[in-house]
């Protein structure tokens, strides 16, 4: 259906799900605890870990990704707090979109409905790249149920430029190379995703998925200033997505209460470039925890 992300055929979906389940079994560090949440825009797949509570870490991957992108973080984050890793609606994964997502308000709506369904009252949203954009859309358009947000090299803070698209295309090509060449390309491109053989296999299995999500519109200064919850902003020093120093400077001017950090030696794939730092920063930034 036009305007709805989906696989090109039922056969393509079945083939993808088979690979997805194998990769989940290979990578997920704890016994998977899946659940499906029905929203007004589709059914959202999520995975729970950790103790019960109304203050989960809710993990949102970037464009083209899903919950499995967080496999290196789940166990540590769930030591003493609930974790919910999400297959974002409209991205390639086990979630199933049923209605168009036309703008940021829609992107925030499905997430708000998920938070309500899981009983979250003080969720800590953790969004990488496009997942960061989605997290802020929830806070701006459907406020409530969120106590804090961590943005990991998020999209939406500057227009997408040629440098990013070159990085994306070269990364896609490098993902098809043998492991040894991929390691060299990962260093040259500042892209740790190229070291993730299983995730690359999953991405290749999703090549017949059609993504139909709204074009990314950068946040205005007024929107950033209007965010009503504590925010932590982690930026990759060498990110191909934007000029990280300029983004940090902009945020310092319009949202001075945000915690800002440009992480040396990392790129746009910060969530994988420095897993330990990202996990530690998320756990430490819990301003609403009782």
Where are these regions (language model features)?
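Alpha/beta-hydrolase fold catalytic core
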Residues: 1-57, 80-81, 121, 283-290
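Gly/Ala-rich beta-loop-alpha elbow adjacent to hydrolase catalytic centers
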Residues: 127, 131, 135
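Hydrophobic, aromatic-rich cap/lid helix
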Residues: 194-222, 238
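Flexible "cap/lid" loop of the alpha/beta hydrolase fold
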Residues: 136-140, 147-176
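Catalytic histidine-centered segment of alpha/beta-hydrolase-like enzymes
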Residues: 266-275, 279
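Conserved loop-alpha-helix segment in the C-terminal half of the alpha/beta-hydrolase fold
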Residues: 75, 232-266
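Active-site loop/oxyanion-hole signature of alpha/beta-hydrolase fold enzymes
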Residues: 84-126
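Conserved HGGG/HGGXW glycine-rich cap/lid loop of the alpha/beta-hydrolase fold
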Residues: 45-93
């Amino acid at each position: 259906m036009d305007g709805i992300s989906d696989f090109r055929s039922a056969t393509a979906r079945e083939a993808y799900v088979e690979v997805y389940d194998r990769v989940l079994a290979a990578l997920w560090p704890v016994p998977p605890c899946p659940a499906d949440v029905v929203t007004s825009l589709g059914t959202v797949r999520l995975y729970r870990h950790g103790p019960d509570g109304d203050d989960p870490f809710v993990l949102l991957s970037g464009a083209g990704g899903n919950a499995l992108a967080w496999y290196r973080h789940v166990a540590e984050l769930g030591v003493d707090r609930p974790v919910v890793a999400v297959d974002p609606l409209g991205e390639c994964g086990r979630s199933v979109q049923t209605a168009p997502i036309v703008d940021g308000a829609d992107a925030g709506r499905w997430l708000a409905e998920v938070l309500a369904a899981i009983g979250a009252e003080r969720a800590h949203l953790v969004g990488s790249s496009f997942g960061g954009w989605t997290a802020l859309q929830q806070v701006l358009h459907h406020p409530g149920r969120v106590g804090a947000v961590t943005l990991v090299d998020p999209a939406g803070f500057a227009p997408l430029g040629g440098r990013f698209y070159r990085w994306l295309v070269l990364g896609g090509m490098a993902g098809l190379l043998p492991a040894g060449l991929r390691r060299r390309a990962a260093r040259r491109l500042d892209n740790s995703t190229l070291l993730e053989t299983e995730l690359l296999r999953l991405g290749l299995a999703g090549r017949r998925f059609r993504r139909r999500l709204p074009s990314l519109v950068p946040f205005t200064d007024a929107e950033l200033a209007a965010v009503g919850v504590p925010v932590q902003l982690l930026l990759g020093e060498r990110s191909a997505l934007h000029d990280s120093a300029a983004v940090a400077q902009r945020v310092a001017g319009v949202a001075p209460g945000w915690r800002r950090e440009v992480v040396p030696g990392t790129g746009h794939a910060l969530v994988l470039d420095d897993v330990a730092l990202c996990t530690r920063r998320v756990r430490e930034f819990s301003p609403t925890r009782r």
